[in-house]
Every structure is written in C-alpha cells, then in structure tokens.
Swiss-Prot record:
Induction: Expressed in the late phase of the viral replicative cycle. This is Baseplate wedge protein gp25. Gene3D superfamilies: 3.10.450.40. Keywords: Late protein, Viral baseplate protein, Viral tail protein, Virion. Signal peptide: none annotated. Belongs to the GpW/Gp25 family. It is found in: Virion. It comes from Enterobacteria phage T4. Its main location: virion. Homodimer. Interacts with gp53 and with the (gp6)2-gp7 heterotrimeric molecule; The gp25-(gp6)2-gp7 module is involved in sheath contraction. Part of the baseplate macromolecular complex which consists of gp5, gp5.4, gp27 (central spike complex); gp6, gp25, gp53 (inner baseplate); gp7, gp8 (intermediate baseplate); gp9, gp10, gp11, gp12 (peripheral); gp48 and gp54 (proximal region of the tail tube). The gene is 25. Baseplate protein that is located next to the tail tube (inner baseplate). Involved in sheath assembly. The gp25-(gp6)2-gp7 module is involved in sheath contraction. GO terms for cellular component: virus tail, baseplate. The lineage of its organism: Viruses, Duplodnaviria, Heunggongvirae, Uroviricota, Caudoviricetes.
Amino acid sequence: MANINKLYSDIDPEMKMDWNKDVSRSLGLRSIKNSLLGIITTRKGSRPFDPEFGCDLSDQLFENMTPLTADTVERNIESAVRNYEPRIDKLAVNVIPVYDDYTLIVEIRFSVIDNPDDIEQIKLQLASSNRV
C-alpha cells in the first residue's frame, strides 16, 4: 500500500502563493477531492480543448424537482467522474432531492485505487442561483 499523501498532487484550486512564491499544491486525498469538485462544478462545454469535461448540472437545477431530475444528475456525475478521475475506485453517487428548497444533496462515496478498502465521502448541496 502506497502513501497517497506523496503519490498524488495537483495545483491547489485556490491558487494561493506558496512560501517559495510558487503556486501551492494540494496533496494526496485532498487533491483527489478537489479534482472531484472541479469535475462536478465545471459546466460541460466550458473548456475549449476538452468540451466533454464536466457535468451538465445547471440545466437540471432549473427543472422542476422530480425523482427523474435527481436520477439524471446522479448519472451525469457518475459518468463524468468515471471518465475524468482515474484515481477513483468503487464509486457510488447518491442524489437526494429536497423538494421544499429546490436543492439536491449529492453524496459521493469512493475509494482511492491504491487503497480500495478505505471509503471516502464528499457531500455537497446543489441549488439553482435564482430561487424565488
């Protein structure tokens, strides 16, 4: 079993300056979680050199909140993560609609490919920005 804190690194999404005046990095599990959030929150088609990167979530967030909406979001997230995050194993996505708030609670459970016995979790709330 490898030490994933040394194995994986990415540029920190906050783009803070490090002590050596270089862009800071996120390491290990944090880099994988940041990557997942980047995949989920990037609108498909917004990257000119890879138009398939990201999820089509904004259209669903403006639809009527139904079980079908939650299922579509769940499938979109699962497909995008499987296509763009190779460090993930045992992926499970669960989307829970909150009808009164017009929001979706997204729970993502996964394991890192180098450590498949440890299950990690990300939980986030998605909402349209134009709520009445």
